[in-house]
């Protein structure tokens, strides 16, 4: 085969591969959304727009477009913006884009977070993961699993994310620590205190304790025996 022929063959193979990748991305959109006709045309156009501005394969872009459209019910520029955010989030954190959209969507619904705050939430999750070393998948799971308790305690979503990241960074067993926090809420309520007041008073007392034994005694009074050790370690 001549050099020219080999070059033409190479271009042909590359074109076929590129077409196949695009087709796979479009197929993913159809599978995830069930869209047809003009609705599908709009989604594939958005996929093309995202794909043309990011160093990602079309399969990943198709996943993002399909999942974001299905869960956030957005189209056009808003769909493209949010899809880009999730593609970048997944790339930075080494996660699956479909799982990322799924988990974050559940968190936002559980906490009634407006879709306009998606970028801020993704940024916070990424920042805490980078600061503490916890994987975003694990962090998201912790926040989802304990969201009812967090809301009962009056903690905001950013506070909950930060708390669980710090637990992990300090080697604290989150299950035991949450048991301690639940006990703290019960004690605070019985004494007519708010959760913030009870935690603030106790943390100050634990930090200022003269001995580890004294710190443990103080923590036990508020967090209970099961959670005292973990909470003292965290504080």
Model-derived features: where do they sit?
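A short, structural motif
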Residues: 1-123, 127-141, 150-158, 169-176, ...
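Flexible, solvent-exposed coil segments and beta strand-coil junctions
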Residues: 140-143, 225
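Extended alpha-helical or coil "stalk/linker/tether" regions that are enriched in polar/charged
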Residues: 159-235
